[in-house]
Amino acid sequence: TDHVSPWALFDLMPHVYTVSSQFGFEALLAGCKVTCFGMPFYAGWGLTDDRVAKPARRSRTRTATELAAAVYLRYCRYFDAWFREPVDAATAIDQLAFLRRSYLSNATPVAGYRIARWKQRAVSAMLDGPAGPPIFHRSLDATLTDARTRRAAVAAWGMDAVKLRPRIEAEGISCMAIEDGFLRSVGLGAAFVQPASLVFDRQGLYFDPTRPSDVETILAEDSFTADELQRAASLRHRIVEARVTKYNITGNAVPLGLPAGRASVLVPGQVADDWAVLVGRPRSFPAGENVNAILLQRAKARHPAETVIFKPHPDVEQLGRAGALDEAWLQRHADVVARNTPIDHLLHIVGHVETYSSLAGFEALLRGIPVSVHGLPFYAGWGLTEDAADTPRRGRKRTLDELVAAALIRYPRYWDSISGLACPPEVALRRIAEARGGPRRKSGIVGVIMGRGVIMARRLLRSAKGIRR
């Protein structure tokens, strides 16, 4: 009565007895002897031991290969699991195999800790498996009790997981840190736009260089097959062709008035109090100083004869996060401030990127642009970037396609919010590219308003706490 795949039993059962079950057809394909006490579609062709008379119209003798060709290739029609478009049998089989692998890979139950309600749908879809979807809790005690009872892993968002990991693992419970993947959405997470990809890191997090992460371990230790690297190259080319980035914030490419015949350098701004900036900060970036100011000054000093373009981070510009620079100061240190120009447009016109740890550096690498790194992002230290900081754990040289295979194929999980199914990165890329080129959804506008409201509420709470002190 257990849930067991028939294919796991065929090696143990050389002979199958059935009335008309589909099990008998699959047993034939597996090479088993099949006795039928009914007359299913696969009986009467000389392949089965038939205990009832066959219809006169089944007069021909067929091979198992001919039977499979008739059933799978000529009789059935197939549709893409995510886009509902006609596909051939081989493609349908590959897609079903992917969905099966994704489902079975989640054999361990999961107890979710303090995961926001709007994120739970994506997390559930990516972690659903034989043990069922995650069970979400608000308190740590309830989470740990559930984990002990069901022998579950604990999943928590970002630095919540990093901070609690020692306590959780001290009890013999596995802990996963969740964060957005690198092909995320059309719009910001702060605007409650659902993610197309998430990472579930069992060691650290990709933006925390103080400890290993799963993606760092993949790059430091794993090997990649030729097929994986070919797939990575294809994925990279498609990303560049579709001009897809992490958030894909669209807008009109405002003319920047760049001097003709002069090379340009992009300096992407970051959120100054983001964990990606605060943890593992090199001594050359003193704590308490605006990372964007230091970075911009260095870029200008390193490229005095080039046009330095500063792109403020959208969360800083739109949602008031930390890291803003005084306008007069900006005018002195940046040749151009590209506030409303989409990052994908900038990556098509610059010849160099100077970054602290922005994902724009990774996106520039995908496009073949030289990148100088002043912090310790996951893509630094592998021989692909000019690194200002030491990366002692990352001594292995990697190719760009190996980096893509690790960061975009092996490390994240992907989810298609339209079908509700787990999906490979190619499907997520197509969804993002199509959404990026289509009209903005009304929910996106509502999300931006709600996102700004959340930021304002946080500010008010911080102010109130300061007054109470």
Model-identified regions with their sequence ranges:
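Catalytic-core helical/loop segments in enzymes performing group transfer/polymerization on anionic/lipid-linked
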Residues: T1-R469
